[in-house]
């Protein structure tokens, strides 16, 4: 991709994040984005059909960032492809993504920006669903996978949102999430073919 295109698209995305600090997504217009970014609407529409297409690409960027982090973690500390370590690496990648891009994600709550919440939730949901479907040799959900994934994703997002509100320290946030989710993996919600894997 042309460097000028990359630079322009990055500016547009950064501008939307900046606008979210003071304005709900539903009240942000393409004109507002362009005015703030010093970009013409013609340029904007060269790349995006509307602001929703812009956000969709941002979600894809974020998910690619998280997946790259996940695969790097797997290569670094889970060459044996242990299911539990894989779950933890997936959680780490999601937490890293959200904390590294806090200016965006702290404005994706159900109350402030429901469209952004539902959009990104669907990406996370599909990611976790795919993981569980492909990595449940040793840890198998006892109940329907879609219900387990809904519980895990809503819970994770709720904890992160609450942590943002309370300005929870990153290390403490990570510790609490890992403790909670490893307890869930030990619980009766999952059937373990090798009981000692979680520890």
What are these regions (language model features)?
Residues 92-121, 161:
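Amphipathic alpha-helical segments used for helix-helix packing
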Residues 133, 154, 162-199:
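C-terminal peripheral helix-coil segments that are non-catalytic and often amphipathic
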């Amino acid at each position: 991709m042309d460097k000028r295109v990359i630079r322009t698209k990055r500016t547009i995305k950064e501008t939307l994040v900046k606008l979210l600090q003071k304005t709900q997504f539903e009240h942000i217009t393409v004109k507002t984005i362009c005015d703030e970014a010093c970009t013409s609407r013609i340029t904007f529409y060269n790349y995006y059909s509307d602001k929703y297409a812009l956000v969709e690409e941002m979600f894809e960027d974020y998910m690619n960032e998280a997946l790259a982090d996940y695969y790097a973690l797997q290569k670094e500390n889970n060459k044996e492809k242990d299911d539990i370590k894989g779950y933890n690496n997936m959680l780490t990648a999601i937490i890293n993504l959200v904390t590294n891009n806090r200016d965006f994600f702290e404005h994706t709550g159900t109350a402030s920006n429901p469209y952004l919440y539902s959009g990104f939730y669907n990406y996370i949901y599909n990611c976790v669903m795919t993981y569980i479907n492909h990595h449940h040799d040793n840890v198998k959900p006892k109940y329907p996978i879609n219900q387990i994934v809904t519980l895990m994703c809503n819970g994770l997002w709720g904890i992160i949102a609450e942590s943002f509100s309370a300005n929870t320290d990153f290390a403490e946030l990570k510790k609490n999430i890992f403790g909670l989710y490893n307890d869930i993996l030990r619980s009766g919600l999952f059937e373990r073919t090798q009981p000692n894997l979680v520890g």
